[in-house]
Amino acid sequence: MNSGVCLCVLMAVLAAGALTQPVPPADPAGSGLQRAEEAPRRQLRVSQRTDGESRAHLGALLARYIQQARKAPSGRMSIVKNLQNLDPSHRISDRDYMGWMDFGRRSAEEYEYPS
């Protein structure tokens, strides 16, 4: 479930980044003003190129993450397999503890009920 949330957040960030494009000025006044604006525009173009590269890198990372998430075993069986890999002296190797209560019910062997 955490991977799904992370995936949604990552997609939202990428979408927000793609939607925030610079707006061109309505009407530049004079050639002196145009020259003054050209330098920041050049810097903006360079930064947009690096942003595009980082977006491509993020896209590649996202594709690898999705691929790994599909390959990874999930659910109860993967947990059981991981527990089977524990060494036999580990405390939870067999998942059967002394005094374990199943959903709040005690086992019938522990208590004698009056008849």
UniProtKB/Swiss-Prot annotation:
Coiled coil: none
Localization in the cell: Secreted
Tissues with expression: Detected in cerebrospinal fluid and urine (at protein level).
Processing after translation: The precursor is cleaved by proteases to produce a number of active cholecystokinins.
Positions of the pro-segment in this chain: 21-44, 107-115
Subunit structure: Binds to CCK-A receptors in the pancreas and CCK-B receptors in the brain.
UniProt name for this protein: Cholecystokinin
Source species of the chain: Homo sapiens
Gene (UniProt): CCK
